[in-house]
Amino acid sequence: MVKWSELPPEILHLISLKIDNPFDLIHFRSVCSFWRSSSLLKFRHMTSLRCPLPLDPGGCGDDCHILSSRVYLLKCPNRDRPQYWMFKLQAKENGEVVLHSLFLRRNSSAYGCLYPSLSIDLLNCQIFELAQEHVACYSEWFELFECISKCEERIGFMGLNREKNEYMILGKLSFNGLAMYRSVDNRWTELEITPDSFFEGIVPFKGKFYAIDRTGKTTVVDPTLEVNTFQRSRPCDKTRKRWLLMTGDKLILVEMCTKSRYDFHIPNIREKKIWFEISELNEERNDWDQVEDMDGRVLFLEHYCTFSCLATEIPGFRANSIIFMDLWGGSNSYELESILVYEFNEKGVRSLRDKLEYIELFPFPPGWVISNG
């Protein structure tokens, strides 16, 4: 059997070209000196994908591009006490990579800790990719104020062929309803759906896009632009907010509920009488089936990104809990008070400050990560 270190250099180089994660490339290059000399020197972050919108009356929209981010979990088990950190890396329009604080909408420049001033010992730490985020950024002309506004919108993103840079995007953006952008066509196509719907979640799942609006209607869009819609068989009139996310091979609907709209708008977080309901997509019946358990997972409902991980991955985390952002503006959006926790067993909302075992996961960045070297 041929030794790994004796693989032809051209094959090693081709393999390194197909690695789409910067930390995986570092691990690949660390196998031996021959692999390092035969592979990419460093990960090549691509400039933002462009998807120009039709020009609006103010001549805006042709600058539309996609900002891509990845969420990582860093584990450092070789210390006196295992430590963990969850963070986001965002590739800017010019390909520059910026460190972002998860849930707190600020980047490394705002914090005063410029990337790449962090040094991570990958020999003694493990890094896992938890999720990817894609956001459409574009300019829009506001006739009322006669000014240009910079907009960010959640989208669904589906990569088709990485080598040929082929992809599809589904979003509302400046359109009346949903529209799809296909890179092979290099244009947007508006879908024939009810206009002026506000979509609370858009995700790709098994080769299709799923979007849900604030009425609870689910829209399914095929790459061929075929559109189907369905309402759940048991609608809930208590739902105030919805999220979609994938957990393993399942598509999950998360609904925040209150008995009345007044309860939803109570400013004091501790007095909020809210609860969450979880449902799984039933593809055969085009319906959402409510479930009582989240398979031991913790759900993260971020501004543009939703994802999950097993509670056993992080000691101290409790299964069947949800971490989400303050939707009511009752706290400082740049502080940990704006990150909230809901646990199904306790039936109540708390600030992250009240859950000491969770706090260490989100500082920006924790002191043990920063290197002065």
Curated annotation (Swiss-Prot):
Domain named F-box: residues: 2-50
Keywords: Kelch repeat, Repeat
Listed Pfam families: Beta-prop_KIB1-4
InterPro entries, alphabetized: F-box-like_dom_sf (IPR036047), KIB1-4_b-propeller (IPR005174), SCF_F-box_domain (IPR051304)
Chain positions of Kelch repeats: 165-207, 262-308
Organism domain of life: Eukaryota
SUPFAM superfamilies: F-box domain
PANTHER family: DUF295 DOMAIN-CONTAINING PROTEIN, F-BOX PROTEIN SKIP23
UniProt protein name: Putative F-box/kelch-repeat protein At5g24040
Organism (species): Arabidopsis thaliana (Mouse-ear cress)
